[in-house]
Amino acid sequence: GKGADVSASGAANQIVIGKGAAGQGDNYAVIGNADVTRLYAAQDGAGVLYANGTIQSSDRRVKHSITDLPYGLSYIMKLRPVSYYKKQPKNYPQDLKDKFYPDGKVREVGAEDYDKLQVGFIAQEVKAVNTEMNAENNIVNVDEDGFHRMDYEKLVVPMIKAIQELTAKVEKLEQHIEKLESEEVYIGGEQ
């Protein structure tokens, strides 16, 4: 793109795409600059991104109004894990075909992606749980046309909160059991 800069001092094997994008060093692929906020592998969500990991910005210096998450186990318990098979794009509702394939050329996708049992959630159901619990998070994203997407990695946060809540309950029960055992309580008989 215009103004792309691949000149990261002496860097090799780099790809830089987009207006004002700058190289980062050896073996980097950079797509866009700080203005790029979305990257689609395929508009219909059928694309697959292969990576060994992803890293998201989480630096305290770029955050404000930090508070403890108020929900955990109660939130997780309302979610419905499901298994499903993906539909072939030709079987999408017409409004989605119009959105993803405006030229009318609906692509056929290989069976290797559509014959595999998938596991996950229904984004509309998760959004309903968010509304019910007044949970402001960006786990569910809805685009301007009403297409729902989920950021599954963000579910880790309420899951960790749920684990913390369960751990606190277990510790309290363990203390109660220890107290009962130390008092040598006998039920239904004499010492």
Q: Where are the regions that the model predicts?
A:
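Glycine- and small/polar-enriched repetitive beta-structure motifs of secreted/surface proteins
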Residues: 1-53
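Glycine-rich, acidic and aromatic/proline-enriched surface loops and short helix-turn segments
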Residues: 78-81, 123-136
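C-terminal intramolecular chaperone/auto-processing assembly modules
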Residues: 102-110, 132, 136-191
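Stable alpha-helical elements in mature extracytoplasmic
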Residues: 72-75, 122, 159
